[in-house]
Every structure is written in C-alpha cells, then in structure tokens.
Amino acid sequence: MKQLTVLTLVVFFFAACSNSSNKQNGEKSASNKKVTLTAAGATFPMPYYNMVFKTYTAETGTQLTYGGIGSGGGIRSLTDKVVDFGATDAYLDDAKLADMPSDVIHIPTVLGAVVIAYNLPGIDGLKLSNELLEKIFMGEITKWNDPALITNNAGLSLPDKNITFIHRSDGSGTTYIFSDYMSKISHNWADKVGKGKSLQWPVGMGAKGNPGVAGTIKQTEGAIGYIGSEYAFAQKIQTAKVQNSSGNYVEPSIESVSDAAKGEIPADTRVMLTNSADPDSYPISGFTWIILYKEQNYDGRSKDQALATVQFLDWLVSADAQGQAEKVHYAPLPVGAAEKAKTILRSVTYDGKPLLQ
C-alpha cells in the first residue's frame, strides 16, 4: 500500500509538471496539431504566397490554401468570416475598419512594384513621364507614334499603331496602388477618375486579376497596362521606366522598390509608398498586407486554428520567409516594418488572452 501511494504521488507530480508546462507553452503544444488554413485575396503577391505557403507546409505540416480573387474579394471574405485571413494591397481606411464586424489588424508581408507593361516587339527601354502617363491612360494619346512619345523617347522607332489600355475588371489592390500614384501626379486624373480598388475607366478594356491583364497585354500588340512586377518578369513582358518625384526615370527592381520604403512607417503599417521622395525609388511601389481579426474567438473558431494562424504569420514576417522574396521579384520588408508586424501579431488574442508571447 505504501509503495502504491508513492507511485501515485510520482505519477501525480509528473502529470502536474506536464500540465504546468503545457499551460506555460500552450502555443507549442497546440501548434503540434495539424490544421488547414484558408486565405483569399490579392493576386499582386500571389506568386510569393504560393511559394512560401508550400515551404511552410513542408516544414510544419500545416496545410494552407490561397485563392487569388483580388483585394476586394479578400476583404469581403474576411468580412463574411469564410477565411482565416484575407489579403489586400489596399489597406482598410478608418471608415472601412469601423464597418468591419470587429477589430481588424494589418500585417505587411512583402513589398512589390506595379509596373507599366507594354507590348511593342523590338522596342525596349520606353520612358514615360508623368504627363505621358496621364494622357495615355486618360485616352488623350491614342497612337504609339504620338509626337510627345517620340520626343520623350529619342532613339526609339515607335510604330504607327493604336494604343490599347488594359486595366483590371475586378476589385483590385493593384488598381488601388496604380490609381493612388496617378492621383498624386495628375490633378486631372484625381478629379475625373480618382483612386480606388474599382474605377470608372475613361478608356480601355478590362481583364480579371493580374494573370488576366498580363495575358491580355502579352497577346495584344500595342497594348499597355499595369500589373504586379512578377507577372511581367515571369512572362517576359516589356516594362517602362517611370519618372519619379525627383524627375528620374527608374526601372522596377528589388533595390528601387526597397528605396520607396525608406521613410517612416506608422505603428499600424497603413501607409502608401507611391511617389516616394527618395531619388532612386521606383514610384509605383507598395506594401501588401494580410488582414485578420484581432480577437480570434469567433463563430466557433478553435484555439488551435487561431494559434496556427498567428504562428504562420509570425513566420511569414521572419527572416526565413522574407529571405525568399527576391526569388520571385519582391522586396523583403524593411527591418522596422517587420518588427512592427511582429508587435501587432502579439496583440492578437483568443478570449482576450494573447496567443503569442
């Protein structure tokens, strides 16, 4: 009987230690349970997400699925609570945040360029000034051999061919970045078209998603449009040098996109990087964000699901994940932005208690 009592005490002691350890390291024990995370939204960062999602699944066993349905779709999916997190290139402004079912946070994940892509076989190195961009996209310049284009591109044999503007037909963060830039460089654009995820276009034809716009430009000689840089590089579509705020013509590159983010980043990371004051910056650059609810206990959502979500996002802004960005022509987050993202993630709760320490 004495031996049995001692054995019982020993078992109780180890059980208590194990219990205490699990409470202290609840995040680790919960993370061992395999879950599936579902996300949807922006097509702008989709090549990067597809790559790093596979890496994370291989390393942890956590399954991730992503639907590239545009930033507008990503915001709607989070609003309807049909995804673990949404993705958008256009941050939610104060009015939109107030309309959401509960508090939403933004996690920047990568930096990218919206390039001006065109299809003129054999004619590389096109330079587009602010004035030319305005007149082309407002429909005032309709031919590639317009005198203003020729004057700005000495040495290029621009053809007598109609310009066909290809734009997005769906709600798009890429459109938001592009139109935010256009609104900064052109009062005419700001007054008549403005900025947004969906616009009333003065000219052009629509295509769905970055893949749709890229494909249409590639198939249409004389076409011009705006797409995420990776889509242009992957399909070998020509891109223009764009005039920045210092008057310099800059190509989209990892370096020139990173230069656009040299300014101060606010604590909530909601900032547009277009038309940066840095003289070496590519002017149509931007963050892309993951959005999620700050309180994760909603609609019967389990703590395991919530913990898996924030653990993945914590990894996504880590050096390991950021180090993969350049493989698909994105720029990694500046150190300051990554640190702010990690701080924001530590505010995410389940039943009011932080999920990450």
Residue ranges and their predicted role:
Residues 13-16:
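C-terminal motif of bacterial Sec signal peptides marking the signal peptidase cleavage site
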Residues 1-4:
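Positively charged n-region of N-terminal signal peptides that target proteins for export
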Residues 18-357:
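Flexible loop/hinge segments at secondary-structure junctions
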